Swiss-Prot record:
Pfam families: Microvir_lysis (PF04517). The lineage of its organism: Viruses, Monodnaviria, Sangervirae, Phixviricota, Malgrandaviricetes. Keywords: Cytolysis, Host cell lysis by virus, Viral release from host cell. InterPro entries: Micrvir_lysisE (IPR007605). GO terms for biological process: killing of cells of another organism. It comes from Escherichia phage alpha3. E protein is responsible for host cell lysis. GO terms for molecular function: enzyme inhibitor activity. This is Lysis protein. It comes from the Viruses. The keyword Ubl conjugation does not apply.
Length: 75
């Protein structure tokens, strides 16, 4: 087997330095999948919180409490 010369080692290191960023680009997104799902969960919780805090007032003075409109002051 042939020994590597200094020129061979430098060429190998140059090739490695050119390939390393592309390897990182391939593997980094899979590391952040958990963070993305956590962000979606927080966004959903915020949306549900905003929806539950909306004030509802009766549409008319009728006795049916199920007919409601959204209070325009909150928006």
């Amino acid at each position: 087997m042939e020994r590597w010369t200094l020129l061979d080692i430098l060429a190998f290191l140059l090739l490695l330095s050119l390939l390393l960023p592309s390897l990182l680009i391939m593997f980094i997104p899979s590391m952040y999948k958990q963070h993305a799902s956590l962000w979606k969960a927080r966004s959903l919780a915020k949306t549900l919180s905003m929806a539950s805090s909306a004030r509802l007032t009766p549409l008319s003075s009728s006795r049916t409490p199920c007919v409601l409109k959204q209070d325009s002051k909150k928006l």
